[in-house]
Amino acid sequence: MLTLDTLNVMLAVSEEGLIEEMIIALLASPQLAVFFEKFPRLKAAITDDVPRWREALRSRLKDARVPPELTEEVMCYQQSQLLSTPQFIVQLPQILDLLHRLNSPWAEQARQLVDANSTITSALHTLFLQRWRLSLIVQATTLNQQLLEEEREQLLSEVQERMTLSGQLEPILADNNTAAGRLWDMSAGQLKRGDYQLIVKYGEFLNEQPELKRLAEQLGRSREAKSIPRNDAQMETFRTMVREPATVPEQVDGLQQSDDILRLLPPELATLGITELEYEFYRRLVEKQLLTYRLHGESWREKVIERPVVHKDYDEQPRGPFIVCVDASGSMGGFNEQCAKAFCLALMRIALAENRRCYIMLFSTEIVRYELSGPQGIEQAIRFLSQQFRGGTDLASCFRAIMERLQSREWFDADAVVISDFIAQRLPDDVTSKVKELQRVHQHRFHAVAMSAHGKPGIMRIFDHIWRFDTGMRSRLLRRWRR
């Protein structure tokens, strides 16, 4: 069967122009205009998706089949082009009957053209074929437009669903244009409104816990650029004012023991007029034990020093992926569970904004893994947030899973984050020594996010940095009161 792409080539129908018109009309639709105004960050992400739409439309037109009636009419037209005028005159009745049987738009006009001329000349033969071709072009264009209209409705429905999803999650997960673009890519999955409302719920909870949000941001920025001195920096003269004690007294600063007669306290001076205490006065004068006023003054002077014009270089520290281990034991249930999930959502936001990876591992009696920054990141995040924390704590298995992941090439610069209350058994010696080796040899960093003030110090001593967020009732009330 004839394909629409072949028909377009035969009749020189420009499908590219039709596709461009359809895309322009789609982008100018009122739904997208309102959405772009409300979420400007997502406008660039949707615009970047236009080449994919264009390619999908081309593929749809290329694979579309031409209806049998139109196919038969096109084949008849091609055969008629090969006929000479005498042959065409002989075949004309059959051609007219075929057009009538196929309900061709050209059938009625063709019969009128033949009836209006008593003699079929070469010029009439050419005119007949030209008008027939125009009729076929109109039919092919109409077929293209019908297919594109169907695709436009389907594409608009898909875009509206993704816009609804992205619009709901943009305030929670998109911190910049990079994050907005990745969020739009993730929205291509089959998600229902009830599913992603779970992310909205934890996003609202995170906004209610600004201290937890700041903690995640501090952890995300923990690899800032470090300044290091330059050895080849040029020197310049730098003048500064320094303050020094002055010899001229300006104000009373206190009391002291001295032999300064001019600054004697009145009680000391009174002892000089008492005969019995006169010798005591002279003794204390010689020993500088008289109570006197202490006066103090200060002055400023200019100090000239030399220093480098540019005295520092910046050693940019790489920001690698996050490997986050979350304790899913029973002791982490309730408010701890909410905080742990919201903290992971905050790390996902940072990962999307900085084009990093965010890998979550839930550890209890077994380990469950989620990739929150991949193409299916939203679905993975929903599955993670749907998990319930119950069971025991196997911290050693968590560390072994982290170390196994860190040994792969794609995770060589990752930061490991463990979220727990750290109320668990001590780590085996082999695990501790392996962690220290990774810290020393490969500069891997291990962060602890402590959800309790009662974590075991012996376990937490292994971490490079401990981020504390006490979820006890007293700490929660204090945080609420400070707000």
Curated annotation (Swiss-Prot):
One GO cellular component, as annotated: cytosol
Record-linked CDD domains: VWA_YIEM_type
Keywords noted in UniProt: Chaperone, Cytoplasm
Main localization category: cytoplasm
Signal peptide feature range: none
Gene3D superfamilies cross-referenced by the UniProt entry: von Willebrand factor, type A domain
Classification via SUPFAM superfamilies: vWA-like (SSF53300)
Subcellular compartments: Cytoplasm
Protein purpose: Component of the RavA-ViaA chaperone complex, which may act on the membrane to optimize the function of some of the respiratory chains. ViaA stimulates the ATPase activity of RavA.
Subunit structure as annotated in this protein's UniProt entry: Homodimer. Interacts with RavA.
Similarity comment text for this entry: Belongs to the ViaA family.
Identification of the protein by name: Regulatory protein ViaA
UniProt source species: Shigella boydii serotype 18 (strain CDC 3083-94 / BS512)
Biological classification of the source: Bacteria, Pseudomonadati, Pseudomonadota, Gammaproteobacteria, Enterobacterales
